[in-house]
Amino acid sequence: MDKLLIKGGRSLAGTVDISGAKNAALPELCAALLTADTVTLENVPRLQDVATMLKLIRNMGVEAERGTHAPGTVTLHAGALSSPEAPYELVKTMRASVLALGPLLARFGEATVSLPGGCAIGSRPVDQHIKGLQAMGAEIVVEHGYMIAKLPAGQKRLKGVSITTDMVTVTGTENFLMAASLAEGETILENAAQEPEIGDLADMLIKMGAKIEGHGTRRIRIQGVERLHGCTHQVVADRIETGTFLCAVAAAGGDVVLRHGRADHLDAVIDKLREAGATITAGEGFIRIQAQGRMKAQSFRTTEYPGFPTDMQAQFMALNAIAQGSSTVTETIFENRFMHVNEMVRLGAKIQIEGKAAVMEGVEKLSGATVMATDLRASASLVIAGLVAEGETLVDRIYHLDRGYDQMEAKLRGIGADIERVRA
């Protein structure tokens, strides 16, 4: 099992190229199921979750090829499927497999999708997906660990309806967007998620011929069409990777330009970093961060977009750990999302968990130790902590990191970090 060995204490300087967003690429790979034409995706990140999704749709019969000279380009052709099924063996490590449910139902009238795995950060139920697709006319049963869905006899398409979810659900909104694009009539999504990745998926679907209005707001209208065609689409830049590098520079100090970063997708995080003492400037296709000395600790509360993202909570906590002053971090989205805390404490952080909140007292220095990653964003937070800790930090179980970060250690090395992958 690979590990990362980090020698802390170096400031960071240079340029980092931000990759395409994992949370946009995964639904967009599934969107290729909606057409028999060729779909070309550009700026697709090289991640374990993306590799798993490609394996999944290939298993269904989709032709999917990465460009040899342009590895960020993936060409997809779902002319016919051999099997509209997402088996447990392929999806047990990745929750995003549920995104195949809507497209398969909409185009082929049937789908068998394993209940998803992939995250250790609390229950993320798929009941909202099932309720919404049932409202559109699908018959769905859950048995033996699978969601088995089909259209009723004699019904050729899903039906447009109004769907109001009990809570804001990102993957639910994406599933309904894709399913409704080929449904009969109009679908209205109330309480829709507003994340930039959803807007990017909607932009791709519109290029394919979908009729969608209101994406980026809480109310999305989709007028179903009989067929969608192919398109070429560039995956939006990863705002969480961007935020992770911003926190790393704020913690370690330095002057770094993030190419392709979108400041307008990270307002809540950038506001907190500026309050902490970092100087951040942004323009078309770049963000620059300059940080010197200890930052000031910042309290925050995670909420749905455009609020502070839960996917940035752990990374900002790594910054707070060595910042001046005390802070309170409140997690409102997921349970079990403080699993990185025990590992940070091993490095010398002062953190107390009080229900849904973590109360932190910044320390002047952390000291290197062996720590274990527990989930994707927790692993990133431990890397940031390792960059500022005295001595050597060894981060174990970094397969979590590989699920969501494209060559993170190489990018950090490129801006001056002393970090290397240790092959087991």
Swiss-Prot record:
Reactions performed catalytically: phosphoenolpyruvate + UDP-N-acetyl-alpha-D-glucosamine = UDP-N-acetyl-3-O-(1-carboxyvinyl)-alpha-D-glucosamine + phosphate
Residue(s) carrying 2-(S-cysteinyl)pyruvic acid O-phosphothioketal: 119
A GO MF label: UDP-N-acetylglucosamine 1-carboxyvinyltransferase activity
Residues reported to bind UDP-N-acetyl-alpha-D-glucosamine: 95, 124-128, 311, 333
Listed GO CC annotations: cytoplasm
Keyword flag Ligase: no
GO biological process: cell division; cell wall organization; peptidoglycan biosynthetic process; regulation of cell shape; UDP-N-acetylgalactosamine biosynthetic process
Family named by the database record: Belongs to the EPSP synthase family. MurA subfamily.
Protein name as catalogued: UDP-N-acetylglucosamine 1-carboxyvinyltransferase
Organism from which the protein derives: Polaromonas sp. (strain JS666 / ATCC BAA-500)
Gene that this polypeptide is encoded by: murA
